[in-house]
Amino acid sequence: MEKPLDQRRFIWIIDDTDKIVHVNDAWLAFAGENTAPQLTANVVLDQPLCRFIQGQETRYLYQQIFSRVRAGVSPVKFPFRCDSPDCRRFMEMKLSLLSGNAVEFISHLLREEWREPLDLLDNSRDRSGEFLKVCSWCKRINIPGQGWGEIEDAIEPLDLFGHHTTPRMTHTICDSCHDAVKLELGLE
């Protein structure tokens, strides 16, 4: 029997200086359920959001999004992925302007695809000094000479099972996700 789709809304708010000032109970529960139990209210509140965003390109794009939302392009919606070792999670995020230049984030699950667990996505695994580029939005891996593909498609060409230690992942944004976000923001 298929598991019912999670209907919760995961909400967090940043103030005008981009510090996290609110996370709802659903957000905290989701973090605890999905390989990030360390993300408690005590850890995330009053911290700059950029502390929790990996990759220079991704941080820069979020800054562009915040600027556009604060300039009146609100709400902004875009799809993203929030995968775990055993599940692809397709989600949507909506950013809306609140009073005082605060920004509210509301994300929700669109669909899930369950799979065999992948060590590459297990945060508890030891990591080598090698790096794989992963898109922060769609979670595809950059496969040199082939472009961006699902993690399962990258296993053989990148010899991921041949490594004694799992490579580290460095976050960026692929061209198609970058173009989609820019289009949503009216930057094209």
Where would I find each of the regions flagged by the language model?
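Sensory/regulatory domains in signal-transduction proteins
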Residues: R8-F10, I14-L121
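PAS-family sensory modules
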Residues: M1-D16, L45, I65-A71, L97-E188
